[in-house]
Curated annotation (Swiss-Prot):
Domain of life, per lineage: Bacteria
Organism: Rickettsia bellii (strain RML369-C)
GO biological process: translation
General function of this protein: Binds together with bS18 to 16S ribosomal RNA.
UniProt name for this protein: Small ribosomal subunit protein bS6
UniProt similarity note: Belongs to the bacterial ribosomal protein bS6 family.
Gene name as annotated: rpsF
Length: 120
């Protein structure tokens, strides 16, 4: 078994419930083939770096996988066939960290209010 990180972008008009169904379908494929999802991160609705088709925004999702290359290929095939997924990228990695990804860390610090302690 190998470790993979897969990031996919779902169309902006898809609901969070539908995104959860997509992730559940991917989880089922992996678990049915003796693999495991080690990490799941929803990065939120973000602006795309460039327009893809008619899309300017998308829901970003990261999956950390422990599976075989054949199952990874099947997962990528399902991503290609899913009309709600506008882009995806899967990379082989040496290990999957339990820490939040840098994007998720940055997102959580952006949402944290800054308190000015110098003002009296």
């Amino acid at each position: 078994m190998s470790f993979y990180e897969s990031v996919f972008i779902v169309r902006q008009d898809v609901s969070l419930n539908d995104i959860d169904k997509i992730v559940d379908d991917f989880s089922k494929i992996i678990k049915d083939n003796n693999g495991a999802i080690v990490k799941k991160e929803y990065w939120g609705l973000r602006a795309l770096a460039y327009k893809i088709g008619n899309h300017k925004k998308g829901h970003y999702y990261l999956l950390g996988l422990d599976t075989t290359p054949a199952v990874k290929q099947e997962l990528e095939r399902k991503m290609k066939l899913n009309e709600n997924i506008i882009r995806f990228l899967t990379q082989k990695v040496d290990s999957i960290s339990n820490e939040p990804s840098p994007i998720l860390k940055n997102q959580s610090t952006e949402n944290t209010p800054v308190i000015d302690v110098t003002a009296n």
